[in-house]
């Protein structure tokens, strides 16, 4: 199974590392360091499967020899803390063939390193038995200028150190405890060296990690894809494994137990158990979802049955529904016509009002522009000796009045009053028309919108309602009728009491088991009928007595009233 691994480290002179020594280690070749006069030969050639060097555009041809390349960068970097190279280690998927390994690795180097001006040497390794395939990429830590073929400049710059509030940190004199001052008395601030090398930036390192995952996934099946993100970034709660390393695996191959390998085995068992639990929960939730969907389907079928049973009833209201829809559309169009007439009348009334009046903005703008026009008229009509002075005065007045106009009419776009009399008069006409149009725009806009709505309403009124609309309204009318009938039946139903009128007539045939026999009472049928008749007689007597109390004449025979002697 393919795994993801990519690590980047510095070849730092401060920690005793050398680019030439690292080159000898990854290539398994003998390398001479020209700067120090030392020769490195780490051997282990049996683990090295392939070595290659890829150069950017404009690089010298002799840099194709990795020993020449990294001796050159060692000689160019003279600082005691210099970092002449970077080392990138990537895990190669076991699913790759030897040719795919080379293609993926060289494509990755060209796209991410050579394209930015970096030269690099790679070496493909395994453990000597075909396991643990991986690659070392040694990158010269300075870009090559494509124009000159030499090393690029400006690797770093100085920047101020900032505190947590984003403010500069003062440089304190340890003797006095005060902030240091330079020779001119200026305060000193802490500064630090910031690398301008893209390989030292976090964004570039993230890009390298993501690009390696994409390069491998382009050649892997979907079931063997790798992900450059951490488990936390992926939103997974699985525990990540730790790096085992060559020494730990060597202990395991020798029959021992490595602490790192044992830790990873426990982590994998825990992750496998968690994955199995999650898979089982997913299967249970899927089954619950299927059952829920089935129940929803049954409920919908039950809800659809009353609609299907009511289908024949809506036909009775089909004609009424169609006429109602047509009437509603006609009423809507008529209402829009009335609103449109009112809106047009409002526009005419406002236009009439404008002939004799004006808004505050209108009057203010006229007064402001008239002042500028008067100054420009005086300049135009002035004599030869005063014309220059009055023209300058007209320009000054036009500028001042333009400022006043911007304050009086803030929404007006063109507020620059010309100093020329003819242009100022034309500006006056344009401005007053703009104020008039701005005041009328809500009313004319309402008229246009009502005209559009009326056109749509008249078009809809001229069309027949669709069958779906007719059926929907007819169904609602049928439902409303059924609810009204149900309420009427409930209102007319008498309340149950002991004095309900009884049907005393005996059915022609009770059948084998009459209602009286089903009660299993000891009384006979004749006894029960007698009791029921007595109960009815008592109730009839009570009703007659109540009637006599209300109207005493109702119980006596009617008497003739006349003028007898």
Curated annotation (Swiss-Prot):
Coiled coil: none annotated. It comes from the Bacteria. Keywords: Conjugation, Mobility protein, Plasmid. Residues 479-565 are annotated as: Disordered. It holds the Pfam family MobA_MobL. Residues 524-549 have a biased composition (Basic and acidic residues). Residues 497-511 have a biased composition (Acidic residues). Belongs to the MobA/MobL family. Might be involved in plasmid transfer. This is Probable mobilization protein MobA. It comes from Bifidobacterium longum (strain NCC 2705).
């Amino acid at each position: 199974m393919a795994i993801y691994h990519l690590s980047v480290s510095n070849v730092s002179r401060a920690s005793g590392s050398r680019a030439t020594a690292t080159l000898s280690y990854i290539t398994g070749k003998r390398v001479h360091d020209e700067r120090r006069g030392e020769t490195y030969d780490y051997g282990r050639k049996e683990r090295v499967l392939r070595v290659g060097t890829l150069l950017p555009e404009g690089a010298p041809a002799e840099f194709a020899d990795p020993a020449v390349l990294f001796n050159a960068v060692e000689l160019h970097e003279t600082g005691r803390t210099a970092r002449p190279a970077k080392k990138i280690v990537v895990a190669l998927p076991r699913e790759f063939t030897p040719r795919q390994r080379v293609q993926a690795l060289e494509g990755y180097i060209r796209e991410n390193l050579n394209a930015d001006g970096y030269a690099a040497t790679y070496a493909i390794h395994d453990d000597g038995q075909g396991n643990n395939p991986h690659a070392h990429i040694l990158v010269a830590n300075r870009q090559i200028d494509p124009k000159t073929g030499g090393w690029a400049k400006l690797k770093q710059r100085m920047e101020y150190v900032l505190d947590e509030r984003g403010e500069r940190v003062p440089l304190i004199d340890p003797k006095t405890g005060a902030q240091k001052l330079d020779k001119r008395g200026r305060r000193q601030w802490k500064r630090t060296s910031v690398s301008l090398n893209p390989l030292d930036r976090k964004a570039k390192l993230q890009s390298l990690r993501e690009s390696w995952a994409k390069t491998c996934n382009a050649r892997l099946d979907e079931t063997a894809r790798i992900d450059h993100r951490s488990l936390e970034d992926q939103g997974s709660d699985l525990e990540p494994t730790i790096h085992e390393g060559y020494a730990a695996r060597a202990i395991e191959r020798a029959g021992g137990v490595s602490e790192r390998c044992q830790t990873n085995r426990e982590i994998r068992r825990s992750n496998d158990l968690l994955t199995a639990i999650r898979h089982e929960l997913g299967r249970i939730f899927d089954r619950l979802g299927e059952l829920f969907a089935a129940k929803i389907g049954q409920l919908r079928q039950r809800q659809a049955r009353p609609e299907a049973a009511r289908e024949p009833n809506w036909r009775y209201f089909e004609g009424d529904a169609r006429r109602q829809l047509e009437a509603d559309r006609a009423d809507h169009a008529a209402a829009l016509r009335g609103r449109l007439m009112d809106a047009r009348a409002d526009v005419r009334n406002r236009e009439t009002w404008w002939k004799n009046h004006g808004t505050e903005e209108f009057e203010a703008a006229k007064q402001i522009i008239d002042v500028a026009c008067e100054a420009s008229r005086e300049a135009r009509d002035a004599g030869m000796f005063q014309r220059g002075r009055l023209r300058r005065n007209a320009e000054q007045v036009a500028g001042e009045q333009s400022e006043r106009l911007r304050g009086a009419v803030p929404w007006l776009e063109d507020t620059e009053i010309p100093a020329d009399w003819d242009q100022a008069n034309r500006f006056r006409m344009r401005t007053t028309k703009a104020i008039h149009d701005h005041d009328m725009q809500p009313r004319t806009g309402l008229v246009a919108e009502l005209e559009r709505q009326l056109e749509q309403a008249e078009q809809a009124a001229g069309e027949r309602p669709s069958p779906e609309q007719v059926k929907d309204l007819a169904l609602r009318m049928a439902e409303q009728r059924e609810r009204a009938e149900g309420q009427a039946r409930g209102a007319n139903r008498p309340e149950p009491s002991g004095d309900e009128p009884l049907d005393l007539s005996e059915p022609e045939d009770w059948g084998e088991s009459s209602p009286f026999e089903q009660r299993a009472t000891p009384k006979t049928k004749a006894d029960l009928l007698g009791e029921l008749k007595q109960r009815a007689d008592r109730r009839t007597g009570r009703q007659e007595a109540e009637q006599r109390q209300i109207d005493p004449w109702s119980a006596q025979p009617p008497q003739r009233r006349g003028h007898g002697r």
